[in-house]
């Protein structure tokens, strides 16, 4: 069963105390801005639940290390485990490593999400919404700017081992396939691995070709910011280029407030973090949980960005 839950609903359902429980978590990597916000929020939330012991470890973007971490955490006798998976194609291996210990995947969708047993669940946001919201808003902005007869641009992918990156890029092509947006053409797409620095280098390389372009779509804010930094360093007027991304991080909103960033999509770190802990507690107590719990994405533009300050 799939369930969509608002953050307000999750906050309302917050547990203030539990019978003594231990939950362990492993994250793909600590060195990631958005995941840091997610992790910090989870530590804070868990700390407010009496009787709950919560620990988290860094997989350093190493799948083998993460699988060992899952096994080690299980061996410690925890009541449940939360996993932000390194490689979304390795769901079966991670699920097997957890054994009979209740498991909740958070943020990144494992490839075995449709085969999870009753003791496992997935809490995140529906990635079909993320790339679609961003790309469609850029499409509308291009039309409003008089570029509806033809617009060319670039697509920056996240890690190709990550389901979110694959889906967000597919979303872009699905939007371009719509009658309203089929005037958009992708000149080139490459991965910048969610990284601001890699995106800056990639954008600099693209610009060196001398191709004219009207938009840049990125799978996350960090890459969008890197692209913007490269364009500004080259002396481009950001009013001439539409840039869209995903996350609505605080850094991204600062860039948007400066007039350099056009579109992002709020990915609710609080909703995903609290939702994953709540699901882990329920599974640890033998309660049933929906196999997929989705926290909605929300479109963010300069007009409504004030509603999202300090949220991620």
Predicted regions and their residues:
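Gram-negative bacterial Sec-dependent N-terminal signal peptides
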Residues: 1-20
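A residue-level marker of the well-folded mature domains of exported/periplasmic proteins
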Residues: 18-312
């Amino acid at each position: 069963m799939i369930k969509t839950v608002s953050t307000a609903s999750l906050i309302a359902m917050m547990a203030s105390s539990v019978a003594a429980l231990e939950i362990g978590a492993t994250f793909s990597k600590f060195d990631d801005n958005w995941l840091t916000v997610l992790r910090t929020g989870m530590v804070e939330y868990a700390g407010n639940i009496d009787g709950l012991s919560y620990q988290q470890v860094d997989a350093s973007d190493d799948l083998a290390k993460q699988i060992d971490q899952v096994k080690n955490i299980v061996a410690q006798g925890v009541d449940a485990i939360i996993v932000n998976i390194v490689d979304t194609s390795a769901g079966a291996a991670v699920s097997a490593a957890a054994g009979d210990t209740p498991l909740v995947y958070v943020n990144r969708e494992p490839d075995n999400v449709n085969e999870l047993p009753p003791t496992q669940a997935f809490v995140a946001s529906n990635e079909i919404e993320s790339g679609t919201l961003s790309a469609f808003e850029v499409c509308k902005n291009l039309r409003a700017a008089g570029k509806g007869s033809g617009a060319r641009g670039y697509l920056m992918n996240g890690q190709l081992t990550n389901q979110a990156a694959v889906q967000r890029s597919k979303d872009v092509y699905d939007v371009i396939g719509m009658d309203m947006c089929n005037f958009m053409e992708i000149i080139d797409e490459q991965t910048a691995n969610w990284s601001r620095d890699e995106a800056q280098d990639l954008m600099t390389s693209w610009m060196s070709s001398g191709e004219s372009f009207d938009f840049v779509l990125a799978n996350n804010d960090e890459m969008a910011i890197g692209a913007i930094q490269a364009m500004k360093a080259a002396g481009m007027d950001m009013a001439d280029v539409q840039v869209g991304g995903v996350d609505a991080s605080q850094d991204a909103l600062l860039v948007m407030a400066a007039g350099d960033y056009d579109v992002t999509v709020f990915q609710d770190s609080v909703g995903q973090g609290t939702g994953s802990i709540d699901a882990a507690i329920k599974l640890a107590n033998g309660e049933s949980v929906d196999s997929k719990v989705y926290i909605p994405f929300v479109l963010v533009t300069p007009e409504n960005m004030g509603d999202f300050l300090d949220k991620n």
